[in-house]
Design a protein with these regions (language model features):
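Sec-dependent, cleavable N-terminal signal peptides
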Residues: 1-22, 248-249
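Intrinsic disorder/low-complexity segments
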Residues: 12, 16, 235-236, 240
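Solvent-exposed adhesion/ligand-recognition segments of exported proteins
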Residues: 20-233
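A short, hydrophobic C-terminal helix/tail in secreted or cell-surface proteins
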Residues: 236-253
Length: 253
């Protein structure tokens, strides 16, 4: 199953890459945007996690554990091995490939995101990405400012790290996307923003939180531990006017 998905992604990326720069107003999650948590194998929770603003989904796996004590806020629902979850996973695969095919404005390989202030754009890491401390995303007065981060392998945050958006809209993390080539791990006490689209798995350690975003794993598991995730409404394409020309580092470490 995993090999088939990877081959499908390669085909989609190849077709998307040539046109991505022209149409990159936002990353369309499709029906995956209705999920705060989406995984393929298992969703496992420990402690009093609170999931709000989206469904919890699993496909093709069948094991969701830890709810309760975890809470899924109404009116959102669990979709386990059903047609809704399967379609969301298919849409996630398409969104992941689209994000991976965007042309990056700046290569940050080998640099820690902590201490940086970045403007809207697409940023890439050939392999892993690390966040230690605070990453500031400056939307420069544009409520629809788009930030895309492409990682060849892992995304890891140190304990008590944070992503902060300034000069943006009321729900700033809604247009921040993290395309992770393998797995993502949010360290204890991390305060994060944006949608994590991981090819494999996502782990949120104790008291790591996502304000305005989601955790979406294509082939693996999502593991939670006393977390809060608040998803947001993904904007329609017709309401977006952002161009991806640009992107830059305002202030380094």
């Amino acid at each position: 199953m995993t090999r088939t998905v990877i081959f499908a992604l390669m085909a989609i990326i190849g077709s998307a890459g040539a046109s991505a720069q022209a149409f990159a107003d936002f990353v369309d999650l499709g029906t995956a945007g209705n999920f705060a948590v989406l995984a393929a194998t298992t969703v496992t929770n420990t402690g009093p996690s609170v999931i709000d603003g989206g469904n919890i989904g699993l496909s093709p796996g069948t094991e969701v554990t830890g709810f309760p004590p975890g809470v899924l806020s109404p009116p959102y629902a669990f979709h386990v091995a059903d047609a809704v979850a399967a379609q969301a996973r298919n849409d996630l695969i398409t969104a992941y490939a689209y994000a991976a095919g965007l042309v990056p404005a700046l290569d940050l390989t080998g640099q820690d995101l902590g201490g940086m202030t970045l403007t809207p754009g697409v940023y890439s890491f050939d392999s892993s990405a690390q966040l230690t401390g605070t990453l500031t995303l400056d939307a420069q007065g544009d409520p629809n400012a788009l930030f895309v981060f492409q990682m060849g392998s892992t995304l890891t945050t140190a304990s008590n790290s944070s992503v902060v958006t300034i000069n943006g809209g009321a729900e700033p993390g809604c247009n921040v996307y993290w395309q992770v080539g393998s797995s993502a791990t949010l360290g204890t006490g991390t305060n994060f923003q944006g949608h994590i689209l991981a090819l494999t798995s996502i782990t949120m350690n104790t008291n790591a939180n996502i304000l305005y975003g989601s955790v979406l794993a294509i082939n693996g598991a999502v593991t939670l531990d006393s977390n809060q995730i608040t998803n947001c409404v993904v904007p329609e394409a017709s309401s977006m006017t952002l161009s991806l020309i640009g992107g830059g580092l305002l202030m380094g470490m």
